Structure formats: C-alpha cells, structure tokens
Amino acid sequence: GVASSNEELEEAKQLGNKIYGFLAEFGFEKPLIAESGNGVHLLYQVHLGNNENNTKLLKKCLETLDMLFSTDAVKVDKKNFNASRICKLYGTYAVKGSDTPDRPHRISRILKEPGGITDIKYLEKLCTLLPQDEKPQQYNNYHPQEFDLEAWLSKYGIGYQKESTSDYEKYVL
C-alpha cells in the first residue's frame, strides 16, 4: 500500500463527517474520532460480548456503511468487524509505502474523545438498511430471474452508475 495524498486524506475526512452525522441522527452516541495518518477512525463504544452473533452484527454494520457511503475515491474499511483486529496506537507514524512529498507519512492522532455507550439496538437498526435477498413467496410470485434491472433502466432511459463489490451491486441513479 501507499500513504494517502493530502487530497485523499481530506476526502476521507469529509466522508467521515458524513458518516458521523448520519450515525448521530440515527441515535449513535459520539465516537472517539481519530486520524489514522491515512484516513479517519470513528470508534463507537458498545458493550457487546465477543461472540459469533455480535461479530456478524458488526460486519453487517460496516457493510451497510460501505453500501451507503463508499465512493470510488474513499472506502469504508469493512475488515474491522472482529475483536481480534489490532487497533492503531495513536501518536505513532502511519508508515505505508514510501514517504514522499505527495504521500507523506503522518502521525496518527485522537481528534475527539467519545461521548457515551451506543446501545446495540442502534447497530441492529443500522443493519436493517442492508438489502436482503428476497425469498420467493407464494403471495408475491417473486421470480428473480425474470427481472433484469439494467434492461428496465435502459428501456425507460434512466441513467445510472453501477458500483460492484464482492458482496453486492449498487445502482446510483
């Protein structure tokens, strides 16, 4: 990997601000806010046991935030859902790639201390925004292979951009 440019770091800060505002409106408490040196960390205090169900819940939360906020330039890191991930030691240098004027090594730092503990109900609520595969039901005659979204959008002249990840496809109108 390489260090982020000043422009990329600024884009990460802007995205972090959007996510912060969204989660605050959603009911989340104030997080610890930090700059990793290459991006932004929003660390929410939650009291969850270290078990498979809670790991899945956190993974879905990050997938939801990725779906809602990631762009071509800035991505939500979806890999930090398990308790065994090592957290940045703030106050140390972020040494990624070569230290160049365009992509300098920076010192990570805490920008704001956290507010309170975020209740699990807000994590669960956030996960409801993640699309679920619809199951065929007798009442809805759902047959996924019969509907082609791209063909339908093209037929009606609706412009879109398609963003694909390993987990889903997002159509931005």
Where in this protein do the model-derived segments appear?
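N-terminal single-stranded DNA-binding subdomain of primase/primase-helicase replication proteins
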Residues: Y156-L173
